Curated annotation (Swiss-Prot):
Keywords: Calcium, Chaperone, Cytoplasm, Cytoplasmic vesicle, Developmental protein, Disulfide bond, Endoplasmic reticulum, Glycoprotein, Membrane, Metal-binding, Repeat, Signal, Transmembrane, Transmembrane helix
UniProt topology in membrane: Single-pass type I membrane protein
MF GO annotations: calcium ion binding; unfolded protein binding
Binding site for Ca(2+): 108, 427
UniProt cross-references to SUPFAM superfamilies, sorted A to Z: Concanavalin A-like lectins/glucanases, P-domain of calnexin/calreticulin
Acidic residues bias (residue ranges): 277-287, 314-323, 556-565
Glycosylation sites noted in the Swiss-Prot or TrEMBL record: 202
InterPro entries per the UniProt record, alphabetical: Calret/calnex, Calret/calnex_CS, Calreticulin/calnexin_P_dom_sf, ConA-like_dom_sf
Function: Calcium-binding protein that interacts with newly synthesized monoglucosylated glycoproteins in the endoplasmic reticulum. It may act in assisting protein assembly and/or in the retention within the ER of unassembled protein subunits. It seems to play a major role in the quality control apparatus of the ER by the retention of incorrectly folded proteins. Required for embryogenesis and larval development under heat and ER stress conditions. May be important for germ cell development. Involved in neuronal necrotic cell death.
Listed name of the protein: Calnexin
Posttranslational mods: Glycosylation is important for its biological activity.
Sequence intervals crossing the membrane: 480-500
UniProt superkingdom: Eukaryota
Amino acid sequence: MLNRKWSFVFLTFLLVISVNANDDVFEDEDEASESGVEKDEFVPSNFVAPKLADTSKPNFFDYFPVGSKIGQTWIKSLAKKDDVDSEIAKYNGEWSIGAPTKVSIEGDYGLIVKTKARHHAIAAKLETPFVFGSNKFIAQYDVKFEEGQECGGGYLKLLSEGAEKDLASFQDKTPYTIMFGPDKCGASGQVHLIFRYKNPVNGTVSEYHAKQPASIGTAYWDDHNTHLFTLVVKPTGEYSVSVDGKSLYYGNMLSDISPSLTPPKEIFDETDLKPEDWDEREQIEDETASKPDDWDENEPQNVVDESATKPYDWNEEENELIPDPEAQKPQDWDEDMDGSWEAPLIDNPACKGLSGCGTWKPPTIKNPKYRGKWVRPKIANPAYKGKWSPRLIDNPNYFEPKPFDGLAPISAVGIELWTMSENILFDNILITSSEQDASEIAKQTFYIKQQEEYRLAAATGSSNGIFQQIVDATNEKPWLWAVYILCILLPLIAIGVFCFGKGSKPAPNFAKKSDTYSPDDDRVPNLVDDQEEEIIAEDEEDNQPGPSGTQNQPPIDEDEQDEVEQQPSSSKTASSESSSAAEEEDNDHVVHENEPVQPTEEVAKKSPRVTGGAKRRTARRGD
């Protein structure tokens, strides 16, 4: 039967083999598909147009049905960006309405960015403007970065009232009320939420950014799948941003946006000026101080060490660096343009192992007389009045914000972005006040599309492996790395402690049942030291034979005597016959019944060889 700990190790080994076997199976499947054994052919499902209840009246909803064209609902911008070169000022990015490159649902179309490295702008008028009042505001859409994303956005601009009058003039300066959606450049991304809020006192409109999570990774852009972005803003100012139905971040307009929506009650008076006699210096130079007479400012900081001597192995005849003898002038070297060619310098091999080469110079050391430039010490300024600041006055533009009061009505939805990637597909754009409608649209569109994309990836072998999924999860939630490390280290530590943490138990010491010599006796260490031998000798003197001619031995236990007497005679005869030869050799060491027992020291002197077993027997008798 296997030891329990080795059984545990064996089971772990089997688990590793099984994982590798699964990997081999996947590889075999890939090889089989390459060798001609085809997987089940993927057949796209048919698109079913989403439907809302008759009572539902969203402000805007477009799922881009077959037959939709640019210029009908969606108007491409003809404007130019301000303050940029004319070559890149135009919004000349191309748009189309069509199917994605990899079709998972037949007949499911979307609005597609067809070009990269260009400015794109397009907008559509809402069926009914959204006015911020007692109802929630909900914006929802899905977007797919088919080519990934190097640098660019995928966000919506919810345009303020008035923009719908001229959608062809839509550009980056067009006023918007809310900007919402993903944006990425480089190795980091974010999901924007920006409010433009109007101060009711002075009429100024300012941008306020929702606080972002520390990191959301790049999976939304790099996995080439469709993702659903949902924004909910309540009249209380509470907002939540979700991706694929899962909360990404949330907060409140009154406390979690930057800068604060609530202006300060007091501000500095810009007309207040600092008095001319206001002294802000905490310390000043002591004008009464003078330089000490022994202060020499001309002493250098370092001086030559006069006590230094040249090392005995210093070679002044060799240079520390020499031209590389193996270097060759490049073939394209032009002496007229590049000057005279010189071989690069390398360390002189003749100086290897020496203290140095070339002209020897004594090293420098810190000058003990150096004191530097003298400056007057600082003292407290008797005229110090503290740090001056303008006086505070009541803020004339202060107001107590109510979240929805400063948000302008929304009349159009636009997409205005610069991107370095093409084939960005927007779909199922919804503006409403009903969370139920948003949930229903997501069920009828995104979740079906998500499952079909997974099915397509599985059928074509383009799905991400388990390792990539783990990495993608850590991009979204970096703290998962700590969980992964613990999940790996803790079992390894447990296995190590379980298998190797305990020492082996020492073998039990079994007492011999007879003094018969055995081959291992010579390898047993002498257990009697010099002091114990003296004690043994004294005990043996006390145990010399008495008048009766016998040694004063301790009484024999009655049970042992009976055990000896009960041994079969045949056993004794066989034992005596088998040991007759040994008795002849050990005759000198046997104490006969009628002979007095000699002291151990005398026996040792007469015996030509005292074995380890004999020493132990002597020690036991002495005890």
